[in-house]
């Protein structure tokens, strides 16, 4: 298979994977679930928080940065003005984001447009500097405890992946991919252990009566922060595992769109 074709396939598969995860992440708010009473509800919410919340949002944000790189440089190769085309797209995204905010406040499209606009500035920056800036901004975003603040760092890191041509050459670095997957697996396992140890039920009514409300609030805040802190490690594991599995024809056939 040609590298360019494989690159497009990998990104398309990852986009579909990220969108599926985002649907799961938003399903509770979409169907307006306000109480979790049954055991099934509790287990579902537990693993929704541990395995899904903030993870697929992170993957999609990273893909936005990669997509920006591809769009920008394809436009330059076609000898058209990439800045004008991108600004037009961002304005459309901003409009859609504003409309989306009316029906589902707090969703990411509006923030994508706001953060995506200054992304043009990083097209003038060396890839090594972008890598450092992206990692710093992502770390600051994680420490803030709010997944929305992941966006700037992930956008820049996605663009940096494009600058390093990793979206084209990822399968040319088989050993590095295996080592990265191994390390990310360790990070994933540690994250799972930590999240299970600090897990708190989604409502005070569901915890032991011996636990005071004040203690519950503190424990829940800790668990909520840990969801955000561990999200980059879990997201990285998902991406690397998914990319690695796509090396095999059987996995590609299983995941291929209908």
Model regions and ranges:
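Alpha-helical transmembrane segments and their immediate juxtamembrane cytosolic regions
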Residues: 1-258
């Amino acid at each position: 298979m040609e590298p360019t074709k494989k690159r497009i396939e990998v990104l398309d598969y990852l986009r579909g994977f990220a969108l599926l995860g985002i649907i799961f992440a938003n399903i509770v708010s979409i169907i307006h679930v306000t109480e979790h009473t049954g055991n099934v509800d509790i287990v579902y919410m537990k693993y929704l928080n541990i395995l899904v919340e903030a993870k697929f949002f992170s993957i999609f944000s990273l893909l936005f940065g990669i997509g920006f790189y591809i769009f920008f440089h394809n436009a330059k190769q076609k000898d058209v003005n990439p800045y004008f085309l991108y600004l037009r797209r961002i304005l459309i995204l901003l409009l859609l984001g504003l409309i989306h905010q009316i029906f589902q406040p707090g969703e990411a499209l509006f923030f994508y447009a706001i953060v995506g606009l200054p992304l043009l500035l990083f097209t003038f920056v060396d890839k090594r500097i972008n890598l450092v800036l992206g990692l710093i901004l992502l770390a600051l975003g994680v420490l803030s405890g709010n997944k929305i603040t992941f966006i700037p760092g992930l956008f820049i890191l996605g663009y940096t992946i494009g600058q390093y041509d990793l979206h084209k050459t990822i399968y040319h670095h088989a050993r590095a991919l295996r080592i990265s997957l191994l390390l990310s697996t360790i990070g994933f396992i540690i994250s799972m252990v930590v999240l299970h140890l600090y897990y708190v039920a989604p409502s005070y009514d569901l915890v032991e009566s011996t636990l005071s409300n004040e203690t519950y609030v503190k424990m829940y805040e800790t668990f909520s922060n840990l969801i955000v802190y561990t999200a980059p490690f879990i997201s990285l594991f998902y991406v690397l595992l998914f990319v690695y599995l796509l090396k095999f024809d059987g996995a590609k056939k299983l995941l291929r769109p209908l």
